[in-house]
Amino acid sequence: MGRERTYHIKQYPLEKGALEIQYIEEFFGEFDRKKTATEIQKRLASRDHCILMAEARLPDDPSLVVPVSFKVSHEIFFEEQDPHLADLVSRLAGAIDFHGRRILYSWIGGTRSDWRGQGHFRALTEQQESWALEHGFKEIVVKTKNKFYGMRATLTHLSFDVIKYERNLLDNRDSKVYVSKRIGPEVLSRHQSERTLTQAV
């Protein structure tokens, strides 16, 4: 039996993390619109957030370590001032209980195509869950689209449950899918990835 793989994860402060996310999103052609560092900083500056990135060595040059997967999450509130987040919260009405509970929104994330299927996204998700529990969050919410079949399958495999489906009548592939996962100590006991975490400076 082979040695279990260790995933190397880095957690970023806001300013540096925003720049790193702007860079890595250039590798994702499937994204409709890529986020700018300024946009990321504006969204996250006034709320608790977590910026995580998985790194791996290049197969053809092991001396080089590159970012291969990322996950950005932040708190959402029942009463939001930001119009986009207020719309999100209104769509979650009846599906998520905000009363006396901290809710974490997994905003953006993905894995570069050459590194998919290797467990990086699971490792990031499990690290995100550990962070969420440590900071008192009770549930993680993710919004995706029906056409991102790989992402939906991964989220299902990671025990995220569908809580709402918004059908797009023009093209069902563009229908919005909302999934969530309740966070507690029992969730951490089911984690499978071996991880190291470092803080970027």
Please give the residue ranges for each predicted region.
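Short amphipathic alpha-helix that is part of the acyltransferase structural core
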Residues: 1-67
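Short hydrophobic/aromatic beta-strand element in the GNAT-like acyltransferase core
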Residues: 49-55, 70, 103, 108, ...
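Conserved acyl-donor/pantetheine-binding loop and adjacent beta-alpha core of acyl/acetyltransferases
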Residues: 61-108, 169-171
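Polar/charged side chains located within well-ordered beta-strands of beta-rich proteins
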Residues: 71-73, 106, 125-129, 155, ...
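Conserved GNAT acetyl-CoA-binding A-motif
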Residues: 102-103, 132-145
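Conserved acetyl-CoA-binding loop-helix of GNAT-fold acetyltransferases
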Residues: 111, 117-130
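Conserved catalytic-core motifs of GNAT/GCN5-like acyltransferases
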Residues: 141-144, 156-177
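C-terminal "cap" of GNAT-fold acetyltransferases
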Residues: 167-201
